[in-house]
Amino acid sequence: MIYGILALGVYITYKILDFPDLTVDGSFPFGAAITVRLINGFGVPAILTLPIAFLGGALVGICTGLIHVKLKVRDLLSGIIMMTGLYTINLWVAGSGYVAIFDKDNIFNNSFVNSITPGFLVNFKNVIIIFLITMVAKYLLDWYMSTKSGFLLRAVGDNDTIVTSLGVDKGLVKIVGLSIANGLVSLSGCIYAQQQRSFEISIGTGAVVIGLASVIIGTSLFKKVTFFRVTSSVVVGSILYKACVAVAMFAGISPNAIKLITAVLFLIILVISMDRKKVKAC
């Protein structure tokens, strides 16, 4: 379910802003890098790494937005530039390409969590904690999207002339959207690092594909389910995606082939969805 938070971030850029943001592949490990540095280097309590990682990712999103809006660089190239630069930044922040935090407290294993967790739930505490954080992120995003700022965010993706006609800077709205999206992605990386108790420089490879696959699976399967919010379908889509990966690995498919298969399936889904849009347009 960690990837559910990642998928929420990708949902903002892909579905709402219509912005192909490849920054995700860099902001996911950026959140992890911040986390291990704060825990290892500064002894910051694990719970505080969550908002700090979110703010770090938000800053990354702002940089992507500024490159696109102020420097007039195309959206795809803006993401590629940030993703490339973040590789080095992540190494600087973490200190090396691999950092372990096995002997440190984290949000899943600390004196407070251990003291309040009933014995029969010990084996499920990781899932429960991730579920709670994901639900908080989801409902906060739902709330934000119901505000005036959230309305402007949806409008700038559908028809940015509406935003301009309201006297609002559409570029600023895009920057805000990118900051929230990458904040969520970085938060996901923060939780991932604490679950794995380590940081590895390559953990962001393919993160955007995972996020997009989750968004497309969720929104496609639950498009006609009226009582399901889109954010809920996106989170469920991430769970279904990981379940499919688990089944594939159980069936004996090499882990090295999983991402290739994911990319091919993702391409097929995209082509099918584009064909459906063309049919509807006709």
Residues of each region from the PLM?
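Helix-loop-helix "hairpin" substructures at the membrane interface of multi-pass membrane proteins
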Residues: V60, N123-E200, V208
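Transmembrane alpha-helical segments in multi-pass inner-membrane proteins
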Residues: N182-L260
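Alpha-helical transmembrane segments within multi-pass membrane transporters and channels
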Residues: G43-T84, M135, G237, Y241
